[in-house]
Curated annotation (Swiss-Prot):
Protein name: Beta-adaptin-like protein A
Compositional bias (Polar residues): 9-25, 654-671
Topology versus the membrane: Peripheral membrane protein
Family matches, as InterPro entries: AP_beta, AP_complex_bsu_1_2_4, ARM-like, ARM-type_fold, B-adaptin_app_sub_C, Clathrin/coatomer_adapt-like_N, TBP_dom_sf
GO biological process: intracellular protein transport; vesicle-mediated transport
Functional summary from the UniProt entry: Subunit of clathrin-associated adaptor protein complex that plays a role in protein sorting in the late-Golgi/trans-Golgi network (TGN) and/or endosomes. The AP complexes mediate both the recruitment of clathrin to membranes and the recognition of sorting signals within the cytosolic tails of transmembrane cargo molecules.
């Protein structure tokens, strides 16, 4: 029998068929509102359940608001819970009706049952109606003094809710001071934890416009408070323990004894069953001992066992999180984990994401003593049914080979992969063989003899085909059929969709031409003609360049395209050391899982106010080389600032440099003179103009004859700065937008300082020793940007500084904004003096 049509189907009994059913509910609730008959509470429960059910599936039942409130006059806690849930959901959208709930909620806040008092207080604070905040102050004050810890816990959270609704009401009622007192004296651990969480959030938000809040926030990091929490840490639940440990990370110990005392207090937390607590403890240990090399290494030894235990005992998801943190530690100290490499062997039932991470860790811990065992294990994975893991295992073998561990055996293993006759194995192996030949040219005979037997028709992946073409061009003299294979590939130019492959074809044809000209001349002509007509800009430009350089001089073209082979000693890492250090600073966060700093995967508006300068995300600066742009304006054009808004950037666009000349776009005529200008430079040789400012670049460090004298030191500073100055990032951002630019200046940075920039946090620590504090930093070579702030010792006067250092020119662009314009020049002198000493012994 066919089902009835949609229009003839009966409505589900769990869903209202229309407004009539909601009206029926309203009528039934009104009838039960004043009834005291036996079983009335059961009837109310059934009706409440229907209302809540409709509400959860998105049906508007706000019309029964009044009836729900009238039926709440009962001692049944289940009814009250459902009523509170309903009221909290509809109160914000019905502020007028919310007034009806105030009386019964305030009455319930005084109930004899602490559970009802707590539930009522939580519901009262969840109304989120600004007009009703005056009714929250009294119940919250009573709740904070309640004898029952559950009510106090709810009241503390309610204070934070009140602050978000009306900050002034919360501050005027002196609730933060009450929370601080509770935090330091309450006997219940959950109340203390809630107080800490609420105060951190309130004071962080208040610090942007209140110096008192800044001081209060700093007081959380005082030694008595930190030790108070650490001594009681066993009383707290896992969430609260993580909160306390995160606070302890920011504490600056006074001496080494302080460090050892904290580690002794937290020693047993490393054995905790909760992985979050263990990772938070590990972060404390690592951060405390960063300046103590020997102890830091011992910490690695100590934390190794707990982390490996968590990896083997948890779910795949937990194992992955722990492994991600272990991977970070393994990369920083591989020798400590070298003996434990078997812990990173893949299990057959593990998810692919766990296996992939373990393969990376096996690559990191490989050394002379364990390479054979690790490579043997990796070769087994190459036959894995999971193609992604098979590819990763082959790449891992290649990475180990590039580390110069047991190269002979590894090359033999890689060449054996080519005999497996699996497309993806062959493709990955060809890419690795190419890299091996770049580093170990002496293996060319063995590799080429095997690679020469591979048909290019069987290679479909662009990277693998590009690697094969590179070998055909680089070793054309050793491969008898190289010109003919290249000719066949060039004839199918139109069928090749990868620009990378077409670029390699052009270069390989050129190289083969210089080694076997008669056999390659026709193919080269075809390739150049096809390349010049190619729609891809890079392919077109390279073909045109090759054509013109061949027209100019064949011998010059050979020196340019096919110079003598030089072995590559080191391959570029995928991540800079600065990125890795930033991820390490964000240990026990998503940054470790994603293997990138938080500023790379969070939106600007969601980053929030960071509490300390070393936690403010990097400021991305695009290092575009434009010789026509004066330095100060170049950085403005490339700025992707985290701290400055659009208005501030627009304001600065018209600011001229210290010579008084604003940026002007280069004319088209200037580009036509580039060649002649380069010729003039080539003829003039090393001679320099007497008026040209001396450049202190990296060449000075390598003894190339340039002067290494430091920049002249400015006159001694006359301004005294506050060594303990504090300024919240939010306040810095607000001031930076409001204050005008007081001074813009350029100064030189000595070569030692340029070299010292490679050490993470080096400039930040140096300037801090001169009472100038960093609030944000970032960039990538050659441009690095820093934002500093300082305060006068005698009065709260702020100096905000933007400093952009270009390592190529060894120049620093300084922009200062000050509360007191009269002392701006004096501060600039102090700043330049400190900067001139950077990197000096």
């Amino acid at each position: 029998m066919a089902p009835p049509a949609a229009s003839q189907r009966y409505p589900s009994p769990s869903q209202p068929s229309g407004k009539s059913e909601v009206s029926d509910l309203k009528t039934q609730l009104r009838q039960l509102a004043g009834s005291r008959a036996p079983g009335v509470d059961d009837s109310k429960r059934d009706l409440y359940k229907k209302v809540i059910s409709y509400m959860t599936i998105g049906i508007d039942v706000s019309s029964v608001f009044g009836e729900m409130v009238m039926c709440s006059a009962t001692s049944d806690i289940v009814l009250k819970k459902m009523c509170y849930l309903y009221v909290g959901n509809y109160a914000k959208g019905n502020p007028d009706l919310s007034l009806l709930t105030i009386n019964f909620l305030q009455r319930d806040c005084k109930d004899e049952d602490p559970m009802i008092r707590g539930l009522a207080l939580r519901s009262l604070c969840s109304l989120r109606v600004p007009n009703l905040v005056e009714y929250l102050v009294g119940p919250l004050g009573s709740g904070l003094k309640d004898n029952n810890s559950y009510v106090r816990t709810i009241a503390v959270t309610g204070v934070l809710k009140l602050y978000h609704i009306s900050p002034s009401t919360c501050i005027d009622a002196d609730f933060p001071a009450t929370l601080k007192s509770l935090m330091l004296h309450d006997s219940d651990a959950q109340v203390v934890a809630n107080c800490l969480s609420a105060l951190q959030e309130i004071w962080s938000l208040e610090a942007s416009h209140s110096e008192e809040a800044c001081r209060e926030k700093e007081s959380l990091l005082s030694k008595p408070v930190i030790y108070y929490f650490l001594n009681r840490i066993k009383e707290f639940n896992e969430w609260a323990q993580c909160l306390i440990l995160e606070l302890a990370v920011k504490y600056v110990p006074s001496d080494s004894n302080d460090i050892f005392d904290i580690m002794n207090l937290l020693e047993d937390r490393l054995q905790h069953a909760n992985g979050a607590v263990v990772l938070a403890t590990v972060k404390v240990f690592l951060q405390l001992t960063l300046s103590m090399t020997d102890v830091h290494q011992q910490v690695y030894e100590r934390i190794k066992s707990p982390l490996l235990t968590l990896v083997s005992s948890g779910s795949p998801e937990q194992s992955y999180a722990i492994l991600s943190h272990l991977h970070l530690l393994v990369v920083r100290a591989p020798f400590i984990f070298a003996a434990d490499y078997k812990h990173f062997y893949c299990q057959y039932n593990e998810p692919s994401y766990v296996k992939k991470l373990k393969l990376e860790m096996l690559t990191a811990v490989a050394n002379e003593s364990n390479t054979y065992e690790i490579v043997t294990e990796l070769c087994e994975y190459a036959a894995n049914v999971d193609i992604a893991i098979a590819r990763e295992s082959i790449r891992a073998v290649g990475k180990i080979a590039l580390q110069q561990y047991d190269v002979n055996a590894i090359v033999d293993r890689l060449l054996q992969f080519l005999e497996m006759e699996k497309d993806y194995v062959t493709a990955e192996t060809l890419v690795l063989v190419k890299d091996l030949l770049r580093k170990y040219p002496q293996w060319s005979h063995d590799c080429i003899s095997v690679v020469g037997g591979i048909s290019s028709k069987n290679i479909q992946e662009p990277k693998a085909k590009a690697a094969l073409i590179w070998m055909l061009g680089e070793y054309a003299q050793d491969m008898s059929d190289a010109p003919y294979v290249l000719e066949n590939l060039i004839e199918n130019w139109e069928e090749e969709h990868s620009a990378e492959v077409r670029l390699h074809l052009l270069t390989a044809a050129m190289k083969c031409f210089f080694k076997r000209a008669p056999e390659t001349q026709k193919a080269l002509g075809t390739a150049l003609a096809a390349g010049i007509a190619d729609f891809h800009q890079d392919v077109h430009d390279r073909a045109l360049f090759y054509y013109r350089v061949l027209q100019y001089d064949v011998h010059v073209a050979e020196r340019v395209v096919s110079p003598p082979k030089q072995a590559v000693s080191v391959f570029a890492d995928t991540q800079s050391s600065e990125i890795k250090d930033r991820v390490f600073d964000e240990f026990n966060s998503l940054s470790v899982i994603y293997q990138k700093p938080s500023y790379m995967f969070t939106d600007k508006e969601h980053r929030g106010p960071f509490e300390f300068s070393d936690e403010v995300g990097n400021i991305s600066i695009t290092p575009e080389a434009s010789s026509d742009i004066v330095p100060a304006q170049q950085y403005e054009a490339n700025d992707k600032d985290l701290l400055l808004g659009i208005d501030e950037k627009d304001e600065n666009k018209g600011v001229s440099n210290n010579n008084g000349s604003a940026y002007t776009a280069p004319s088209l005529e200037s580009s036509s003179n580039i060649t002649s200008q380069m010729q003039e430079l080539a003829i003039s040789g090393p001679a320099t103009s007497a008026t040209t400012p001396q450049s202190f670049g990296f060449d000075d460090l390598f003894g190339l004859g340039l002067s290494t004298a430091p920049a002249p030191t400015p006159s001694p500073p006359l301004l005294k700065l506050n060594a303990r100055a504090a300024l919240d990032p939010g306040a810095f951002q607000q001031k930076w937008r409001q204050l005008p630019i007081s001074l813009t200046q350029e100064c030189s940075v000595n070569p030692q300082g340029i070299a010292a920039l490679t050490v993470p946090q080096s400039l930040i620590k140096h300037m801090q020793s001169h009472s100038i504090h960093c609030i944000a930093s970032g960039g990538q070579s050659p441009n690095f940007k820093f934002f500093f702030f300082a305060q006068k010792e005698s009065e709260p006067s702020n100096y905000l500084t933007e400093c952009i250092i270009n390592t190529s020119s060894a120049k620093a662009q300084i922009k200062v904004k000050a509360d007191e314009q009269s002392t701006c020049q004096a501060f600039t002198t102090v700043f330049e003096t400190a900067l001139s000493k950077f990197g000096m012994p």
